[in-house]
Protein backbone atom coordinates (compact mmCIF):
# COMPACT_ATOMS: atom_id res chain seq x y z
CA UNK A 1 0.00 0.00 0.00
CA UNK A 2 1.42 3.40 -0.91
CA UNK A 3 1.74 6.30 1.54
CA UNK A 4 -1.12 8.27 -0.03
CA UNK A 5 -3.52 5.43 0.73
CA UNK A 6 -2.11 5.10 4.25
CA UNK A 7 -2.66 8.81 4.81
CA UNK A 8 -6.27 8.60 3.62
CA UNK A 9 -7.00 5.51 5.71
CA UNK A 10 -5.54 7.13 8.82
CA UNK A 11 -7.73 10.20 8.25
CA UNK A 12 -10.89 8.13 7.97
CA UNK A 13 -10.19 5.35 10.44
CA UNK A 14 -8.18 7.34 13.00
CA UNK A 15 -5.36 4.83 13.03
CA UNK A 16 -2.83 3.38 10.59
CA UNK A 17 -4.15 0.62 8.35
CA UNK A 18 -1.72 -1.80 6.74
CA UNK A 19 -3.89 -3.31 4.00
CA UNK A 20 -6.42 -1.70 1.72
CA UNK A 21 -7.87 -3.01 -1.51
CA UNK A 22 -7.88 -1.22 -4.82
CA UNK A 23 -10.33 1.62 -5.30
CA UNK A 24 -13.09 1.53 -7.89
CA UNK A 25 -13.92 4.25 -10.39
CA UNK A 26 -16.21 6.23 -8.06
CA UNK A 27 -14.87 5.46 -4.59
CA UNK A 28 -15.68 8.47 -2.38
CA UNK A 29 -15.06 8.98 1.34
CA UNK A 30 -16.63 11.53 3.65
CA UNK A 31 -15.56 12.63 7.13
CA UNK A 32 -16.22 15.54 9.46
CA UNK A 33 -13.58 16.69 11.94
CA UNK A 34 -13.42 19.64 14.32
CA UNK A 35 -10.63 22.19 13.88
CA UNK A 36 -10.55 25.23 16.18
CA UNK A 37 -14.12 24.53 17.33
CA UNK A 38 -15.38 24.51 13.75
CA UNK A 39 -16.66 21.47 11.87
CA UNK A 40 -14.77 20.81 8.64
CA UNK A 41 -16.12 18.31 6.12
CA UNK A 42 -13.87 16.22 3.89
CA UNK A 43 -15.07 14.48 0.78
CA UNK A 44 -12.26 12.66 -0.92
CA UNK A 45 -12.24 10.67 -4.12
CA UNK A 46 -9.63 7.95 -3.97
CA UNK A 47 -9.37 8.30 -7.74
CA UNK A 48 -7.22 11.38 -7.17
CA UNK A 49 -4.87 9.28 -5.05
CA UNK A 50 -3.88 6.90 -7.81
CA UNK A 51 -0.26 7.10 -8.89
CA UNK A 52 -0.68 9.05 -12.12
CA UNK A 53 3.00 10.08 -12.30
CA UNK A 54 1.91 13.23 -14.08
CA UNK A 55 0.15 11.48 -16.92
CA UNK A 56 -3.27 12.52 -18.13
CA UNK A 57 -6.03 11.00 -16.04
CA UNK A 58 -8.90 10.61 -18.47
CA UNK A 59 -11.89 12.71 -17.43
CA UNK A 60 -10.66 13.48 -13.92
CA UNK A 61 -11.97 17.04 -14.24
CA UNK A 62 -15.39 15.87 -13.13
CA UNK A 63 -13.89 14.80 -9.81
CA UNK A 64 -12.37 18.13 -8.82
CA UNK A 65 -14.58 20.81 -10.28
CA UNK A 66 -16.11 21.79 -6.88
CA UNK A 67 -13.06 21.35 -4.65
CA UNK A 68 -12.34 23.55 -1.64
CA UNK A 69 -8.80 22.26 -1.06
CA UNK A 70 -6.30 20.04 -2.83
CA UNK A 71 -3.70 17.68 -1.34
CA UNK A 72 -0.73 17.23 -3.67
CA UNK A 73 1.55 14.28 -2.96
CA UNK A 74 4.94 13.72 -4.56
CA UNK A 75 7.81 11.30 -3.96
CA UNK A 76 10.74 13.09 -2.35
CA UNK A 77 13.14 10.88 -4.35
CA UNK A 78 11.42 11.44 -7.70
CA UNK A 79 12.36 14.58 -9.64
CA UNK A 80 9.61 14.05 -12.23
CA UNK A 81 6.99 13.70 -9.50
CA UNK A 82 8.17 16.99 -7.98
CA UNK A 83 8.26 18.75 -11.35
CA UNK A 84 4.70 17.61 -12.13
CA UNK A 85 3.27 19.53 -9.15
CA UNK A 86 2.87 22.72 -11.17
CA UNK A 87 1.01 20.77 -13.89
CA UNK A 88 -1.55 19.56 -11.33
CA UNK A 89 -1.92 23.03 -9.82
CA UNK A 90 -2.62 24.55 -13.24
CA UNK A 91 -4.93 21.67 -14.16
CA UNK A 92 -6.99 22.12 -11.01
CA UNK A 93 -7.14 25.91 -11.25
CA UNK A 94 -8.23 25.72 -14.89
CA UNK A 95 -11.03 23.25 -14.21
CA UNK A 96 -12.61 24.16 -10.88
CA UNK A 97 -15.95 25.89 -10.70
CA UNK A 98 -15.20 27.74 -7.48
CA UNK A 99 -14.67 31.51 -7.52
CA UNK A 100 -11.82 31.62 -5.02
CA UNK A 101 -8.28 30.30 -5.27
CA UNK A 102 -8.08 26.71 -4.09
CA UNK A 103 -5.63 26.15 -1.22
CA UNK A 104 -3.09 23.36 -1.66
CA UNK A 105 -1.43 21.14 0.92
CA UNK A 106 1.86 19.64 -0.24
CA UNK A 107 2.92 16.25 1.11
CA UNK A 108 6.27 14.64 0.37
CA UNK A 109 5.97 10.85 0.45
CA UNK A 110 8.52 8.06 0.78
CA UNK A 111 10.37 9.71 3.66
CA UNK A 112 10.90 6.23 5.07
CA UNK A 113 13.44 5.60 2.30
CA UNK A 114 16.96 6.86 2.95
CA UNK A 115 17.79 10.09 1.13
CA UNK A 116 20.42 10.13 -1.61
CA UNK A 117 22.07 12.92 -3.58
CA UNK A 118 19.17 12.66 -6.08
CA UNK A 119 16.53 13.22 -3.39
CA UNK A 120 14.76 16.57 -3.32
CA UNK A 121 16.00 18.57 -0.34
CA UNK A 122 13.71 20.01 2.30
CA UNK A 123 15.19 23.44 1.53
CA UNK A 124 14.34 23.13 -2.16
CA UNK A 125 10.77 22.08 -1.34
CA UNK A 126 10.35 25.00 1.06
CA UNK A 127 11.78 27.44 -1.51
CA UNK A 128 9.43 26.06 -4.16
CA UNK A 129 6.47 26.67 -1.83
CA UNK A 130 7.62 30.22 -1.06
CA UNK A 131 7.95 30.97 -4.78
CA UNK A 132 4.46 29.64 -5.47
CA UNK A 133 3.00 31.68 -2.62
CA UNK A 134 4.50 34.82 -4.18
CA UNK A 135 2.54 33.91 -7.31
CA UNK A 136 -0.71 33.85 -5.29
CA UNK A 137 -0.83 30.07 -5.02
CA UNK A 138 -1.87 29.15 -1.50
CA UNK A 139 0.37 26.21 -0.54
CA UNK A 140 0.98 24.69 2.87
CA UNK A 141 3.47 21.93 3.58
CA UNK A 142 3.04 18.96 5.83
CA UNK A 143 6.24 17.65 7.38
CA UNK A 144 5.32 14.24 8.69
CA UNK A 145 7.16 10.98 8.60
CA UNK A 146 4.83 8.12 7.78
CA UNK A 147 6.27 5.65 10.27
CA UNK A 148 4.51 2.44 9.30
UniProtKB/Swiss-Prot annotation:
Top-rank taxon: Eukaryota
Short sequence motif named Effector region, residue ranges: 21-28
Annotated residues for binding of GTP: 51-55, 109-112
UniProt cross-references to SUPFAM superfamilies, sorted A to Z: P-loop containing nucleoside triphosphate hydrolases (SSF52540)
PROSITE patterns reported for this sequence: RAB (PS51419)
Cross-referenced SMART domains: RAB
A cellular component annotation (GO) from this entry: phagocytic vesicle
Gene Ontology process terms (BP): phagosome-lysosome fusion
Keyword Cell wall biogenesis/degradation among record annotations: no
Protein's UniProt keywords contain Metal-binding: no
Keywords: GTP-binding, Nucleotide-binding
Pfam families from the UniProt entry: Ras
One GO molecular-function entry: GTPase activity
Homology family: Belongs to the small GTPase superfamily. Rab family.
Entries under PANTHER family matching the protein: RAB FAMILY, RAS-RELATED PROTEIN RAB-7A
Protein name: Ras-related protein RabK3
Originating species: Dictyostelium discoideum
